[in-house]
From Swiss-Prot:
Entries under PROSITE patterns matching the protein: PGM_PMM
Catalysed reaction equations from the record: alpha-D-glucosamine 1-phosphate = D-glucosamine 6-phosphate
This protein's name: Phosphoglucosamine mutase
Family from the record: Belongs to the phosphohexose mutase family.
Species assigned in the record: Clostridium botulinum (strain Okra / Type B1)
Keywords, sorted A to Z: Isomerase, Magnesium, Metal-binding, Phosphoprotein
BP GO annotations: carbohydrate metabolic process; peptidoglycan biosynthetic process; UDP-N-acetylglucosamine biosynthetic process
Domain of life: Bacteria
SUPFAM superfamilies: Phosphoglucomutase, C-terminal domain, Phosphoglucomutase, first 3 domains
Length: 449
């Protein structure tokens, strides 16, 4: 059995890879490992709008109840809401059934510990080991020792909306905004929060039918939102993904504003308020070099981690940083939540736009994005480290880096899932870096033939 857990829980095609049987086992093992020693543990369960959610929830909950835990089912709700509410309700753990931005046929199961954090690799390995060993030493409970399922009546959504609203001071009156809910988990929470704060709210893709989640919508397909914002003279647009743990934005001119710009704008504002701890933001190695340059001008440090919001969070927790995130729109505000939170990000950004008295595009001028080229080099899995060993490749990387002279960079990343090495170049001249990236990728491929 290979490693079951990926970077964001267990994911696969529902009913084929992520079966009801596997969901039952994950519920049983997760509840047992995360609540060991607790008298009558309670586990919060939420999901996105996928048609397979009901099937997987039934199986997952059966597993949870079989080891004596209570399952509090809150229905369709954003992933970050489960992280927040697990803490607020003093639950022993939280589980979300979602495959985030993936197409409808996929689904996933992701656990949070009692403090609202994603699980460590060690805990995930313990859950997998219990399943692999066929629940050896897990007692079979009967009678009154079996757990109960508790259907929650909407209070959870209300509590999450109130929490998200409390993260900004004042209101959003006078702001005209369009929200793209990706027909996903934010179709109630984000709309209500913005309306209650006084914004003029337009909404698209907020009619989930179980199969239209992420379909030509949300943060992975913002084209309709870009058009809508311009056509309706909105101050800004905000796009969520299926489980609303990320948010991308659109300025009033219809330009897509990614996570790098959001981090730059929010980082600068936190510094102005004296809340940017150690004057530092945390980003990944894939963030644009333009962000580094912009932050340097603002006297803000950038710390870089491996790709993945879990690594960003790890760095933030280690050094008590206030904000971090990824280009994809996973932004973590550690003062507010323990994971990427699309609604909290959207509200922070909207509030800054309103209070600044500037247009959104003017605020985005803080940063100039450098052209970026990504080329895949086909490399066998056992030779993915060739770029670290081969002298000619190393020499070529050094030459390119030297010629870019601080206004560009070379980044090489082996794929974690495919026989590929990704060659990424940034620089001021698109044509030049395109040529250099393809040349370097070809050199790497030729070396493994």
């Amino acid at each position: 059995m290979g490693r079951m857990f990926g970077t964001d829980g267990v994911r696969g095609v529902a009913n084929k890879e992520l079966t009801a049987d596997l969901a039952y086992k994950l519920g049983k093992a997760g509840a047992f490992i995360l609540t060991e020693g607790t008298h009558r543990p309670k586990i919060l369960v939420g999901m996105d709008t996928r048609i397979s959610g009901d099937m997987l929830e039934s199986a997952l909950v059966a597993g949870i109840l079989s080891v004596g835990a209570e399952a509090i089912c809150v229905g369709v709700i954003p992933t970050p809401a489960i992280a927040y509410l697990t803490r607020k309700y003093n639950a022993d753990a939280g589980v979300v059934i979602s495959a985030s931005h993936n197409p409808v046929e996929y689904n996933g199961i992701k656990f949070f510990n009692k403090n609202g954090y994603k699980l460590s690799d060690e805990l995930e390995d313990s859950i997998q080991a219990l399943i692999r060993d066929d629940f050896k030493d897990v007692p079979v409970l009967t009678g009154e020792n079996i757990g109960r399922k508790i259907e929650e009546d909407g209070e959870a959504i209300r509590d999450y909306i109130d929490f998200a609203k409390s993260t900004i001071k004042g209101d959003l009156k006078g702001l005209k905004v369009t929200l793209d809910c990706a027909n996903g988990a934010s179709y109630i929470t984000s709309v209500e929060a913005f309306k209650e704060l006084g914004a003029e709210v337009h909404v698209i893709n907020n009619k989930p039918d179980g199969i239209n989640i992420n379909r030509n919508s949300g943060s992975t397909h913002p084209e309709d939102l870009m058009e809508y914002v311009v056509k309706n003279n909105c101050h800004m647009g905000l796009a969520f993904d299926g489980d609303a743990d990320r948010c991308l934005a659109i300025d009033e001119k219809g330009n897509l504003i990614n996570g790098d710009f959001i981090l730059a704008i929010c980082g600068k504002e936190l510094k102005r308020q004296g809340r940017l701890k150690k004057n530092t933001i945390v980003v990944t190695v894939m963030s644009n070099l333009g962000l580094d340059i912009a932050m340097k001008k603002e006297e803000i440090n950038t710390i870089k981690t491996k790709v993945g919001d879990r690594y960003v969070l790890e760095e933030m927790l280690k050094n008590d940083y206030a904000i971090g995130g990824e280009q994809s729109g996973h932004i973590i505000f550690s003062d507010y939540n323990t994971t990427g939170d699309g609604l909290v990000t959207a509200l922070q950004l909207a509030h800054i736009v309103k209070e600044s008295g500037k247009t959104f595009s003017e605020l985005c001028s803080i940063m100039k994005e450098l052209p970026q080229v990504l080329v895949n080099a086909k490399v066998p899995n056992d030779q993915k480290d060739i770029y670290l060993k081969d002298e000619e490749i190393k020499s070529e990387i050094d030459t390119i880096t030297k010629n870019l002279d601080g206004s560009g960079r070379v980044l090489i990343r082996p794929s974690g899932t495919e026989p590929l090495v990704r060659v990424m170049l940034e620089g001021e001249n698109q044509k030049e870096i395109d040529k250099l990236a393809h040349g370097l990728a070809k050199l790497i491929e030729n070396k493994v033939k």
